[in-house]
Amino acid sequence: MAASCVALLVLALLLLVLLLGLWKRGRQTGRARHMVVVVLGDVGRSPRMQYHALSLAQSGFSVTLLGFYNSKPRDELLQNDRIRIVKLTDLRGLGAGPRILQYGVKVVFQAVYLLWKMMRMDPAAYIFLQNPPGLPAIAVCWFVGCICGSKLVIDWHNYGYSIMGLVHGPRHPIVLLAKWYEKFFGRLSHLNLCVTNAMREDLAENWCVRAVTLYDKPASFFKETPLDLQHELFMKLSHTYSPFQSCSDPSHPDTERSAFTERDCQSGVVRRLHGRPALLVSSTSWTEDEDFSILLRALEKFEQQALTGDSLPSLVCVITGKGPLREHYRHLISQKHLQHVRFCTPWLEAEDYPLLLGSADLGVCLHMSSSGLDLPMKVVDMFGCHLPVCAVNFKCLHELVRHGENGLVFKDAEELAAQLQMLFSKFPDPAGKLSQFRKKLQESGQQRWDESWQHTVLPLLAHSQMTPRPHPPCGHPSCRGF
């Protein structure tokens, strides 16, 4: 009896959705100029989808952006009259029952909730969806598109099942189910974007999905930070984080000092302190695909070299970001008692993060792709700020970092430690390797996001209006299952 009631309720809900969809499908007015951007994650920590929304708005479209609102997005997004943010609610506190049951309940809740939210919106020409996370968003967005006449655009950042595999193992039933789901529904999209050529080739060969590579590019606000703004940022952070505080009082009462800079309050002139520490920056989502023990071991080796009297500076190591393993690594950091290295693990405001990168001396990236097919956006942002980078190696990193040309690549803590010692030797040396890398980045004239998006995505939208189906039938064996 209970099962029959549930079935009738589901059928009634589907009928209601279908009737609403048919009514909305008839409302053609404004659809061609309306776009929906969906991220089943924190909008504030999804910069690429924020960039999509901004680029669409700058191209004259009205945009509805759906996502969780755990972190504040950029002001440019919030202040844009063409962009409306619809906040999604995450289901939390499912502490009872087996984990697989909790996961199933969460997926069902998200599917129904996302469907309800999207059906209440005005019809859109395109639905832009970030994947991962794509469960259950790909199926829901495809279903809404079928009912309302919208075309689905999937932006493949990685494979969701490969991230799940880091936690559960690659042969876990949930992981295999997620892979099947991702492959099946991923083929139903009208357009596909991806972040590397390696992923584009993998999608074509193994999934029969045709995608266009849209590399991550730095937004215009990622640039070198002027010295006066560096000082303001350091003073702001010094109120909360002791590594930014000056170790000594200024000699004059009209002087304002941070750990790196000082400002004459009368003249307003800012200068870098002689003997200042070097500022090393890394950003992370604190997940299993980034092993920060590599950096910690490398810094311990750096400390040993500094204690022997080598011409190495002290370091302030700033690791920004939020994520599930943050407290684990903060505990490990608290057990390190280093004389020449100080740690700081802040979560920065969206506007302060580019300023920090533009003020730093070196960036370190520990991202190791779960699929081996995506690239770390943090390195893109660092390059936009002309910040030299040391990055841990994986399969397609060469599409972004070219060892010895625009950065350095390492495989373990020993190699990273050697690179840190080489780069910071006689710091700050204008003729040193660190300065040479920065100069190369300054001269590279790299493309920015707006230019890349206008050149790559906008023509696809215009062409797709005349192309009903981009995926022809495929007979490749890999497209018939796992």
Swiss-Prot record:
GO terms for molecular function: chitobiosyldiphosphodolichol beta-mannosyltransferase activity. It comes from the Eukaryota. Pfam families: Glyco_trans_1_4 (PF13692). It catalyses: an N,N'-diacetylchitobiosyl-diphospho-di-trans,poly-cis-dolichol + GDP-alpha-D-mannose = a beta-D-Man-(1->4)-beta-D-GlcNAc-(1->4)-alpha-D-GlcNAc-diphospho-di-trans,poly-cis-dolichol + GDP + H(+). The chain crosses the membrane at residues 3-23. Pathway: Protein modification; protein glycosylation. InterPro entries: ALG1-like. It is an enzyme of class 2 (transferase). It is a single-pass membrane protein. Residues 100-120 dip into the membrane without crossing it. Its EC number is 2.4.1.142. The modification Phosphoserine is found at residue 242. Residues 24-99, 121-482 are cytoplasmic. It is found in: Endoplasmic reticulum membrane. Its main location: endoplasmic reticulum. One of its GO terms (cellular component) is cytoplasmic side of endoplasmic reticulum membrane. Keywords: Endoplasmic reticulum, Glycosyltransferase, Membrane, Phosphoprotein, Signal-anchor, Transferase, Transmembrane, Transmembrane helix. Residues 1-2 are lumenal. One of its GO terms (biological process) is dolichol-linked oligosaccharide biosynthetic process. PANTHER family: BETA1,4 MANNOSYLTRANSFERASE, CHITOBIOSYLDIPHOSPHODOLICHOL BETA-MANNOSYLTRANSFERASE. Mannosyltransferase that operates in the biosynthetic pathway of dolichol-linked oligosaccharides, the glycan precursors employed in protein asparagine (N)-glycosylation. The assembly of dolichol-linked oligosaccharides begins on the cytosolic side of the endoplasmic reticulum membrane and finishes in its lumen. The sequential addition of sugars to dolichol pyrophosphate produces dolichol-linked oligosaccharides containing fourteen sugars, including two GlcNAcs, nine mannoses and three glucoses. Belongs to the glycosyltransferase group 1 family. Glycosyltransferase 33 subfamily. This is Chitobiosyldiphosphodolichol beta-mannosyltransferase. It comes from Mus musculus (Mouse). The lineage of its organism: Eukaryota, Metazoa, Chordata, Craniata, Vertebrata.
